[in-house]
């Protein structure tokens, strides 16, 4: 048996903002029809539970101009109204709003105070019309899986390993080589000092014998 995800909505005179609250949605399918039928389905959770919802919106919509963005925590839709006017509610006037549909107060503005559009900077959108109603969209799960396909992040390890391959970094161990060289220089000078000391000792013995004689 399917479950209903929480759906939040807000509007401007020319558009409706619909947010489907469902984290880590997989195989997300969103469909929008000109007559105003909005349907959603996806799986989520460790058990792969099926979530579905179907809403008959208050009026007709412009599918071609409507957009959708699939995120990690939710699916955000900007639905363009076919006619720029305020809706009394999200669903048709002769229907009661389902219990899982709520007002999105973070995006809501009053009709007398038609504020600016919602800031969508940083969000990636696709057009409903250009995606065939988004029916074939693999959803966030597939998208994230595709990122896993980059596997290239594991490439960071290869890159780091490659730096080891530079050997030059190991060359920083060259500091030890410099130290070894200085040690060698010191050891080379020691025999010379010993010879000088021996010659000095012989000279002192000669002087002592001369004084004795």
UniProtKB/Swiss-Prot annotation:
Residues 2-91 form the CS domain. CDD domains: p23_hB-ind1_like. Residues 188-213 have a biased composition (Basic and acidic residues). Residues 168-213 are annotated as: Disordered. GO terms for cellular component: cytosol; nucleus; protein folding chaperone complex. Residues 176-187 have a biased composition (Acidic residues). It holds the Pfam family CS. GO terms for molecular function: Hsp90 protein binding; protein-folding chaperone binding. InterPro entries: CS_dom (IPR007052), HSP20-like_chaperone (IPR008978), p23-like (IPR045250). One of its GO terms (biological process) is protein folding. PANTHER family: CO-CHAPERONE PROTEIN P23, TELOMERASE-BINDING PROTEIN P23 HSP90 CO-CHAPERONE. Belongs to the p23/wos2 family. This is Uncharacterized protein Os08g0359500. It comes from Oryza sativa subsp. japonica (Rice).
């Amino acid at each position: 048996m399917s479950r209903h995800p929480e759906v939040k909505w807000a509007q401007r005179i020319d558009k409706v903002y619909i947010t489907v609250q469902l984290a880590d949605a997989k195989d997300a399918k969103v469909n929008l029809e000109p007559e105003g039928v909005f349907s959603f389905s996806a799986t989520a959770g460790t058990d792969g539970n099926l979530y579905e919802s179907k809403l008959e919106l208050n009026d007709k919509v412009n599918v071609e101009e409507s957009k959708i963005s699939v995120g990690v925590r939710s699916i955000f839709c900007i639905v363009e109204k076919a006619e720029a006017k305020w809706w009394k509610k999200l669903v048709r006037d002769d229907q009661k709003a389902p219990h899982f549909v709520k007002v999105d107060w973070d995006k809501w503005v009053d009709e007398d105070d038609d504020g600016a559009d919602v800031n969508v900077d940083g969000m990636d959108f696709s057009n409903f019309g250009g995606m065939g109603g988004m029916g074939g969209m693999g959803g966030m799960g597939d998208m994230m899986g595709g990122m896993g396909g980059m596997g290239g992040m594991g490439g960071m390890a290869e890159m780091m390993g490659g730096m080891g391959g530079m050997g030059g970094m190991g060359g920083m161990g060259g500091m030890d080589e410099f130290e070894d060289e200085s040690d060698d220089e010191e050891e080379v000078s020691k025999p010379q000092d010993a010879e000088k000391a021996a010659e000095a000792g012989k000279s002192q013995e000669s002087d002592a014998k001369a004084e004795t004689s």
